Every structure is written in structure tokens, then in C-alpha cells.
Amino acid sequence: MKYSLLRGMQDIFSEQIYLWQHIEEHARKILENYNFQEIRTPIVENAELFLRSIGEDTDIVEKEMYVFQDKKGRKVALRPEGTASVVRAYIQHNFFNNPPPQKFYYIGPMFRYERPQKGRFRQFHQIGVECFGVSSSWIDAELIYMLKLFLEKLNINNLTYEINSLGCKRCRPQYRKVLFSFLADKVNQLCIDCKRRFEKNPLRVLDCKVPSCKESLKNTPLIVDFLCQDCKEHFLSLQKELDEMNISYAVNPKIVRGLDYYTRTVFEVTTTMLGAQNAVAAGGRYDDLVELFGGPTTPAAGFAIGMERLIEICSNSLLIKPKKPFVYVAYIGSSVEKEAKKVVNFLRNNNIPTETAYEKLSLKSQLRKADRVGANIVIIIGEDEIKKSVYIWKNMKDGSQGEASLNELLELIRRKYDTE
């Protein structure tokens, strides 16, 4: 019986994996320059963690989360996003006792049982960052600036940065009342999901992508008009910070994000290079989440980038050279196999990607194999070469060749390798 991938999953290999590695390495370099430290949390968590943080009436929890019972009857879930796990780790390991800010980043798979389509998978990958202990809008602006820096380094253009404020637990209840009254007159025009959201959490209605709902919500009261003085000043301060950083942005009062834990700042980065699924990254502030999970009151902010979306864009705009063995060691006869192994290990120990024949092949077959794997230089070892303590080298690109000792060979290869 042949087995194949489950729907919504993917294998990543060959040329594509080099692009993934390039993007991940690029992200690590930028994030670590901003003093973000990598954190790795489990894929499986207590399901209650996500029910409390994301919100029970969100699409993620109601329709998309992979939830099951383990062998002890505990309700567990495959993580649908990364923030809740990092907050749990922040509290469990007492990071709040360390001087703020505490900055973390993660790169890894998330899981949502949704309809697979272009750029959207059931196992997908995110680059995420979380910063704890800073209430200033400076960090919000810095997160957006980091995103801009990262995306532009990947040659991703046509980007739009949109921001909004969702207020706080002091000013949001008043807006909910006003929004509820507004929606009550339009509830029959809403989709089935939004009718349900209207009763449980009317703010969720603003996040609907159904055209008929979007049409009904054209004149919705705006949350920015109901912000308390502190939230208003925080939002104005964010805009000032972005102006000082020369970041072009738009205030979009309709951005609410699909997760319940956000407070104050929320933002999205979109591009015209992706069609309908145009969001590349999104994030915001979640000042109440640490306390909700049993930790001390802690301001926090973060964002997540969709890796599959980046790959879709960068596949056409970034040319990443595949990593191939730079040197192929060919040998003639079983009597020189020991010497060939010594040369292979010597080169690898000196950080030269090297391949060889693990089975007995003719020299012609070995040269053919070296060509197929893309080696730049072939080293040929025979009994005569061992007696003379030299090795034949051949440049597979221009056909030039010569003889050299092992140390001379290393210098020659290094010069060539560094210019590639």
C-alpha cells in the first residue's frame, strides 16, 4: 500500500528547502540584532490554554483547532498559534523576575483544520516574536519597523502597513454596547456565523470577510471614537513613533484581528503580490494575557509572519543557490580507499562540503556522479598519487586540472569556494 500526504499538509525538500532556510536564517539575524532570544515550546498543549487566550467564540477555536483526548483523558490541542504557549512559558519559568524587556522569537509549525487553498495549509509555519514588560508605544512601532526591515531585505515590495487601536478593558465595554445596538438592527443581514458572533462577542463581526456582511458594516461606529484618554494618547504616540521612523501607514478602524487577547495596538501588513490571501504578517498588544494566565500584570506585544506566504512571494523574487557538495573525492582501486576516507574527512573538518563514492565504481562513473551532484572540483586519488604524496584536482566548470599536496589543495579549494 502506498501512503500519501494528508490533505492540507506538505513536504518541503530540494530547492525549496534552501529558500526556507534562507528566510529563517535572515529572520534569526535581524531578530537577534534586536536582542530577541529563541524559544521552543511544545506543539501539543493543554486545550484550555487556547480556549482562554484566543476566545471560545472565535473561528479558530470553534472550527479549526485540532483537539483530542490523550491516553489519560486530558483534553489537549495542537497549537494553532504561538503567543499563548510563549506566555505560558513566560509565567511557568518566572521570566517576569528578570529585568524587562524579555524578548523571545520562535520559528515553527502551527495547526488549523481549515479549507486548504493557495498559500494556506493545515500545518503551516510562523515566525513569531513576543516582547514582555514594555507598555510604551515605542516597542509597538519597533515591531513594525523590524517587520519592514525584514520584508524589504527579502525584496518584498508593494506593502501596506495598517494600524488600529482596540482600546482597553476600561473603554472597550462602552464600545461593545454601542456596536451591539448598531448590529441589532442589521442582524438579519448578517451571515450565520456573524449572527452567532453578535450574541457572544459583537467585535468578532467586524472581522468577517463575507461580502454581504462587509456591506452591512459600512457605517459601523468606529472604536477609535470611544477610546479612553490613555488609549487615545497611546495610539497617537504610536503614530508619532511611526512618523519618526519614516514608515508609511494607514489607520484602519476595521482591523480587530481574529484573536480575543489583543488590547490597544493591532496591525496588519499586506501586499498586492498575494491575491485574496494578502496578509503577510500581523500582530499587536496583549496587555491582559499574562494576568489572565495567572501571572503578574505585564504589558506585552508581538507579531507573527506566515512563512508559506513569504515562500509564495519569494519563490519568484529570490534566487537562492542550492547547497551542493563543492568537492567530490574520486579514487581508483580498493587499495586507496583508506586514503580517500582521510581526504574526505580532512576537507569536511575544514568546512568544505564534500561527497565521495561509498561503493566501488569506475573512475568514469565517479566523474559522471560528481557532475550529477553538481560538484565544482573533483579530487582524484590513485596509487601513483599516494606514492608522490600529491592529488590530482579537476575543475568541473572550466576543465582545468593539476596536482597539489593536501594542504596546497585545501588552500586552492578555499580560494575557489570563497568566490562562489
Swiss-Prot record:
Question: What Enzyme Commission number(s) apply to this enzyme?
Answer: 6.1.1.21
Q: Which residues form the signal peptide?
A: none
**Per UniProt, what is the name of the gene that codes for the protein in this document?**
hisS
Oligomeric state and interaction partners are given as: Homodimer.
Where is the protein situated, by its record's location annotation? Answer: Cytoplasm
Is Protein biosynthesis among this UniProt entry's keywords? yes
Record-level GO BP terms: histidyl-tRNA aminoacylation
First-level EC class = ligase
| Gene Ontology cellular component terms for the protein in this record | cytoplasm
Catalytic activity from the UniProt record: tRNA(His) + L-histidine + ATP = L-histidyl-tRNA(His) + AMP + diphosphate + H(+)
Q: Gene3D superfamilies under this entry?
A: Anticodon-binding domain, Bira Bifunctional Protein, Domain 2
HAMAP family linked to this entry: His_tRNA_synth
Write down the species. Thermodesulfovibrio yellowstonii (strain ATCC 51303 / DSM 11347 / YP87)
Q: Output one GO MF annotation.
A: histidine-tRNA ligase activity
Name the protein family. Belongs to the class-II aminoacyl-tRNA synthetase family.
UniProt-recorded name of the protein:
Histidine--tRNA ligase
